[in-house]
């Protein structure tokens, strides 16, 4: 109230005691200074803590190796880079193998059961260094669990290499058929030897019988040579060749309701039951696969092998799991991949501003980027069309 009575006489005989405005201003300034000092102290403490945390994160980051993955994301090119260490250059050259790109996503499934293998120059028919090598591409679509597909990813190319080197007659059918038989035998023996004991392999069924007997995988494998495109398929994954804009299927899906497969299953004593589609004994939606010991002899690992001569009109090869082919036709997939490869051929306008050398360097590897873009675009198309399975796509540039 003293402030409100400033300059007003209280009585006639009593002296006035006005409150000086300067005292109020000084007190208000002192209060503001206290608030500013308090905020400054908090800011300094927070800044110090933030700097301390950033320094700790930087030290931890320097102690960990960083993974460097090129655009192709092939395991052959995976390198570990440690601080102070120069990265090692790859021994493979761009001219030694076709350009490729791949994508493998879980999609709408809870678990990822697909696997992809790409092995450029994995095998040579003779030891001549000037002789171009053979290139291996594989897509494996597991079911029941992921360990059979992972085992195929780890071992199939090595088995195929051994069979090719043993085969002196260039009999591709025999070499690849024997490879698939060996792969199936390895998967079965591994399950029996492990019995009920778990191994280092982490998977849903923990490699325990009888759950392990209900696990299998499709396999579509392609060996690309300078003159041939060899495709071996077991299951409902698929390989499609794009030649001069025309989609040419290089494999046939092994479905239980295919007339020849239906006859084979019934002659072996099995039945095809239509339960959410045609299924062997009402359980498996494919008639051939690696693994699935509980459905033998109705489900067999014998592949169908096709050998196609390469021509100058060949544009690209597409290998994919049924997560793509269930919703995208051969013609659409070939058209999308072809469009990506053709668009990559168009030269980009060179940058005129200084400091953009990286943009120019990136255009030199446009073929790899084109294959990767094609695989990504096909995967996005499958997901947009509500594919309910894992989606794995490999695109190989066959243009010479």
Residue ranges and their predicted role:
Residues 1-400:
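PP2C/PPM-type serine/threonine phosphatase catalytic domain
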């Amino acid at each position: 109230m003293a402030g409100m009575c400033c300059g007003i006489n209280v009585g006639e005989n009593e002296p006035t005691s006005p409150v000086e405005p300067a005292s109020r201003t000084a007190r208000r300034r002192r209060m503001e200074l206290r608030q500013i000092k308090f905020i400054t102290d908090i800011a300094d403490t927070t800044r110090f803590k933030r700097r301390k945390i950033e320094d700790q994160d930087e030290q931890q980051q320097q102690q960990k190796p960083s993974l460097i993955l090129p655009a192709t994301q092939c395991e052959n090119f995976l390198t570990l880079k440690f601080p102070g260490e120069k990265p090692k250059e790859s021994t493979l050259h761009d001219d030694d193998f076709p350009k490729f790109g791949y994508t493998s996503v879980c999609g709408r499934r809870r678990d990822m059961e697909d696997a992809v293998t790409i092995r450029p120059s994995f095998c040579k028919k003779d030891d001549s260094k000037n002789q171009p090598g053979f290139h291996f591409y594989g897509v494996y679509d597991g079911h029941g669990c992921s360990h059979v597909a992972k085992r195929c990813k780890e071992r199939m190319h090595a088995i195929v290499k051994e069979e090719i080197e043993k085969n002196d007659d260039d009999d591709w059918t025999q070499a690849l058929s024997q490879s698939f038989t060996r792969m199936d035998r390895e998967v079965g023996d591994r399950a029996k030897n492990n019995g009920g004991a778990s191994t280092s392999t982490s998977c849903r069924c923990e490699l325990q019988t009888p759950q392990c007997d209900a696990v299998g995988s499709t396999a579509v494998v392609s060996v690309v040579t300078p003159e041939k495109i060899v495709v071996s398929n077991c299951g409902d994954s698929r390989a499609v060749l794009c030649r001069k804009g025309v989609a040419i299927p290089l494999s046939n899906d092994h479905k239980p309701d295919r007339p020849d497969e239906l006859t084979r299953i019934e002659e072996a004593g099995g039945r095809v039951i239509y339960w959410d589609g045609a299924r062997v004994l009402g359980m498996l939606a494919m008639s051939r696969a690696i693994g699935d010991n509980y459905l033998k002899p109705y489900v067999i690992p014998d592949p169908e092998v096709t050998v196609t001569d390469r021509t100058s009109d060949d544009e690209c090869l597409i290998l994919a799991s049924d997560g793509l082919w269930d919703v995208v036709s051969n013609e659409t997939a070939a058209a999308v991949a072809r469009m990506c490869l053709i668009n990559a051929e168009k030269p980009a306008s060179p940058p005129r501003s200084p400091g953009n050398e990286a943009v120019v360097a990136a255009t030199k590897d446009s073929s790899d980027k084109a294959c990767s873009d094609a695989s990504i675009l096909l995967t996005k198309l499958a997901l947009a069309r509500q594919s309910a399975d894992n989606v794995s796509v490999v695109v190989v540039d066959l243009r010479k």
